[in-house]
Amino acid sequence: NPDNLPGERKDPYTIILPPPNVTGTLHTGHAIMLAIQDTLIRFKRMQGYKTLWLPGTDHAAIATQSVVEKKIQKEEGKSRHDLGREETLRRINDFALDAQKTIISQFRSMGASLDWSRLAFTIDEKRNLAVRTMFKKMYDDGIIYRGYRIVNWDPKGQTTISDDEIVYQEEKTKLYYLTYG
């Protein structure tokens, strides 16, 4: 916590850790990113800055749901429809919390100088309220609106997904022409 650092500190220097998804464990890319940010925050602290490095994890809703559904299908041969909404949500939440504990443990074992007193989870009450409040404000201001648009539909997940989540696959297929008249 920068408020507990010894001596007189000058300007603040803050890094918000890009929150890893709770879909599994950390990989080499996370470790590299952590090492770079840790080096920056420690260097600025040695220069006398009031440093703050905020930790957190991302619930990654659709991705986490997909991982859990695949696990349930593999281990039990059941779908989310077989389990029902409440049981599926409970299992997704349990998985996410377990993965979050593992990720935090990995961060700590790497010696990251994060301010653990300010740990955030993108679906915790404080963040959830902030997102809903801002979403409503943006809707009221006309920035977010409902319109007729082409969307990416995931038939397996039965939901819309963003362009970033699409895996494009080129295929050679036939093209048919229809002539009218």
Roles of regions detected by a PLM:
Residues 1-181:
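N-terminal, positively charged nucleic-acid-binding surface of large information/translation enzymes
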